[in-house]
C-alpha cells in the first residue's frame, strides 16, 4: 500500500457457484477479452500488501494467477463469511503483523482504485471496528475491511450460531460505511447473469 495506513491483505471471494450463468467459476468469465478475475486483480494488487483467492474445489484451475488459493474452513458452502474467515485465519498463520484484510467479490470488474485507502481512513476517522462499501444508496457488505483479531469470534458465529448473513455479523460491531459514486459506472457492479456480462462488456469503455 502506498500510504501510512496499516498493512492490509486482500481476499478475492471466488467461491460462488455461478448457477445463474449455468455453473462454473464466474470470475473466469471474460469481458474485454480478459477474465473478470484479471480485472479484479489489476485493480486490487497495487492497493494491498498481498492478494489471496478464496475458492473451493481444485485450486489448480487458478494456477496461472499465482496467488495463494484458500478454501472455506467451514463445511457446507456457508457463503462469503466463510471466505472472509478463511482469509483472516490464513493471515494470522502466515503474515504476522498484518491486522487487516479487505474482501472483494470475484465478479466485480470495476472495483475502485482507492478502495483500501478509503475503507481504512473511514475506519480510523469513525473509531470503527470494521468498514464496508456502498454506492447508489446500497451497501455492499461483501466489500469490506475486517480485523484479523476477530477471526475466533467469526468462527464461533459461523459454526456455533449458524450465522450466514454479513450484515448480522457487522451489526455486532461499530461499522463505518464508505460511499462511492455509482455513475458513470458503479464500481461495485457485479456480473451475476449472462445479461450482466453483456452489460459489463459495454461498461468497460467507461470505467476508469
From Swiss-Prot:
Originating species: Chelativorans sp. (strain BNC1)
Its ancestry begins with:
Bacteria, Pseudomonadati, Pseudomonadota, Alphaproteobacteria, Hyphomicrobiales
Q: What biological process terms from GO does the record include?
A: bis(molybdopterin guanine dinucleotide)molybdenum biosynthetic process
Task: Give the record's keywords alphabetically.
Answer: Cytoplasm, GTP-binding, Magnesium, Metal-binding, Molybdenum cofactor biosynthesis, Nucleotide-binding, Transferase
Q: Which NCBIfam families match?
A: molyb_mobA (TIGR02665)
Listed GO cellular component terms? cytoplasm
Entry EC no(s): 2.7.7.77
Q: Which reaction does it catalyse?
A: Mo-molybdopterin + GTP + H(+) = Mo-molybdopterin guanine dinucleotide + diphosphate
Recorded protein name is Molybdenum cofactor guanylyltransferase
- Matching InterPro entries, A to Z? MobA-like_NTP_Trfase, Molybde_CF_guanTrfase, Nucleotide-diphossugar_trans
The UniProt subunit note reads as follows:
Monomer.
What does UniProt say about this protein's domains? The N-terminal domain determines nucleotide recognition and specific binding, while the C-terminal domain determines the specific binding to the target protein.
Please state which protein family the record places this protein in: Belongs to the MobA family.
State the function annotated in the UniProt record: Transfers a GMP moiety from GTP to Mo-molybdopterin (Mo-MPT) cofactor (Moco or molybdenum cofactor) to form Mo-molybdopterin guanine dinucleotide (Mo-MGD) cofactor.
> Which of the seven top EC classes does this enzyme belong to?
transferase
The entry's GTP-binding residues are 13-15, 26, 54, 72, 107
| Obligatory cofactor(s) | Mg(2+)
Binding-site list for Mg(2+): 107
* Compartment(s) of residence: Cytoplasm
List the Gene Ontology MF annotations in alphabetical order. GTP binding; metal ion binding; molybdenum cofactor guanylyltransferase activity
Keyword Cytoplasm recorded: yes
Amino acid at each position: 500500500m502506498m500510504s501510512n495506513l496499516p498493512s492490509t491483505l486482500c481476499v478475492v471471494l471466488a467461491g460462488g457457484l455461478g448457477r445463474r450463468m449455468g455453473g462454473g467459476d464466474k470470475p473466469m468469465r471474460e469481458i474485454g477479452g480478459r477474465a473478470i478475475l484479471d480485472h479484479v486483480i489489476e485493480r486490487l494488487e497495487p492497493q494491498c500488501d498481498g492478494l489471496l483467492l478464496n475458492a473451493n474445489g481444485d485450486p489448480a484451475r487458478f494456477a496461472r494467477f499465482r496467488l495463494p488459493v484458500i478454501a472455506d474452513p467451514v463445511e457446507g458452502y456457508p457463503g462469503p463469511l466463510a471466505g472472509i474467515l478463511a482469509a483472516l485465519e490464513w493471515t494470522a498463520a502466515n503474515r504476522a503483523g498484518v491486522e487487516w484484510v479487505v474482501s472483494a467479490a470475484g465478479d466485480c470488474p470495476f472495483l475502485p482504485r482507492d478502495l483500501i485507502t478509503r475503507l481504512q481512513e473511514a475506519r480510523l476517522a469513525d473509531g470503527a471496528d470494521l468498514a464496508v462499501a456502498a454506492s447508489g444508496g446500497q451497501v455492499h457488505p461483501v466489500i469490506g475491511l475486517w480485523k484479523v483479531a476477530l477471526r475466533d469470534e467469526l468462527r464461533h458465529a459461523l459454526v456455533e450460531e449458524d450465522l450466514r448473513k454479513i450484515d448480522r455479523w457487522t451489526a455486532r460491531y461499530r461499522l463505518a460505511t464508505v460511499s462511492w459514486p455509482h455513475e458513470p459506472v458503479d464500481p461495485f457492479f457485479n456480473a451475476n447473469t449472462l445479461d450482466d456480462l453483456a452489460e459489463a462488456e459495454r461498461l468497460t469503455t467507461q470505467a476508469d
